Design a protein with these regions (language model features):
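Conserved N-terminal entry element of GNAT/NAT acetyltransferase domains
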Residues: 1-14, 18, 153
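Conserved beta-strand positions that form and line the central face of beta-propeller blades
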Residues: 4-7, 64, 148
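Acetyl-CoA-dependent GNAT
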Residues: 10, 17-93, 105-107, 111, ...
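Structural preference for beta-strand elements that scaffold enzyme active sites
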Residues: 83, 116-118
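Conserved acetyl-CoA-binding loop-helix of GNAT-fold acetyltransferases
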Residues: 91, 97-110, 129-134
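Conserved beta-strand-loop-alpha-helix junction that forms the acyl-donor binding cleft
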Residues: 96, 118-129, 145-152
Length: 153
């Protein structure tokens, strides 16, 4: 599978909404929530996710992940003089487990050069944590919600 990154553009909003809503639905177990509550709360999650990434990491670059030319995910990367930080990464649920996330991480690692590459992963997301550990990240701390992970150059 050929995995590439391209810059996010305004025309990607429908794809991002679908991706974020599907991801959050799985994260929160929202499949069984009654409508219209489900749509309303997932819409709030979509807006909050986009807004918080832009406020917390001004200057971060949002990428659409493509697998064999089709939109497959989203990666937000914030680069400073001192570090490269993966702010967010999502892959469509039906495409998970196919190496797309690993390919994105490898690409970002290559751009990190001589800087540490840092990220956070939810304490409940053991699959992502194992992936990051396989790719050379180690846990450097944790809070009530997430592990802090780092890969040194």
């Amino acid at each position: 599978m050929n995995v590439t990154l391209r810059a996010e553009v305004a025309a990607d909003r429908d794809f991002l909404r679908r991706l974020i809503v599907e991801t959050v639905t799985l994260e929160l177990g929202a499949e069984a929530w009654p409508e219209p509550m489900r749509s309303h709360l997932l819409g709030i999650q979509y807006t909050a996710r986009l807004h918080s990434r832009r406020v917390e990491y001004p200057g971060a670059v949002s990428h659409i992940v493509q697998a064999d030319g089709a939109d497959a995910g989203w990666a937000v990367v914030h680069t400073t003089r001192d570090e490269v930080r993966l702010v967010d990464i999502m892959v469509l649920p039906e495409l998970r487990g196919k190496g797309i996330g690993a390919a994105v991480i490898a690409h970002i690692c290559a751009t990190a050069a001589d800087r540490p590459f840092r990220l956070e992963v939810n304490l409940m997301n053991s699959g992502a944590r194992r992936l990051y550990e396989r790719l050379g990240f180690r846990i450097t701390g944790q809070d009530d919600v997430q592990y802090l992970m780092e890969k040194l150059p």
